[in-house]
Amino acid sequence: MPQSRRRLIAWVATGLLAGAVLSPAAAQTNPTVAAASDLKFALEEVAAKFERETGNKVRLVFGSSGNFYSQILQGAPFQMYMSADEEFVFKLADAGKTVDRGRLYALGRIGIMVPIGSQLKADSELKDLAAALKDGRLQKFAIANPEHAPYGARAKEALQHAGLWDAIQPKLVLGENISQTAQFATSGSTQGGVIALSLAKAESVAKLGSFALIPNDWHEPLRQRMVLLKDAPPSLRAFYNYITTPAAQDIMVRYGFAMPAVQ
């Protein structure tokens, strides 16, 4: 079986391919949380632990923070929103869609991921990426769409900092969200990409390639904020509050998130 095919099967097994959601039956009985895709592995663990401890379930739907923002403005039936960029939360609050201005729950990081067998090497300062652009080794490189995905916007900023943005644009493959971008970066369909540290930390992703963290002063911070929406049931506040408990934060830290001192 071709290596790229095996990697694709591995991604199907993780449930991280774009569009993966829970069953309609779950939507009818459990409150729905619209969560940024970088949270895929960490938040599933947090929600499972919350369920074990309280007996309460939540439905998690993962996608692009910007797309969720637009959907919520248009009346999408979400009860809680966990964005990878706090500005989307502030805009929803200004539009009267939320109960308040939310709470900062994590700080994210980005890095370069390359699949096993790639001619590209993962290094923090993107030196081999620059060399590959010059010597012709680089054909395709993945980032999330910077127009609506916060991790894509930060990838663009990092590439601009490295002086590579203009040269790399013709080579870019844009993911709809950071999960799809990670699939592109590890499946062999590209030679690598910029993905979330929180995804690279997952064992099922880490085994597909190598990863190097990009300096956090190369881009604006990924200040990730959550908020309850106006129609959130009272029971969902327990999950909202659980996100910032030590039990949940221990899981988040294990996936590479930093915990904010000021919320």
Locate each region found by the language model:
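Twin-arginine (Tat) signal peptide motif
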Residues: M1-T14, G19-S23
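Exported/periplasmic ABC-transporter solute-binding proteins
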Residues: P24-F62, G66-Q74, S83-E86, F90-T98, ...
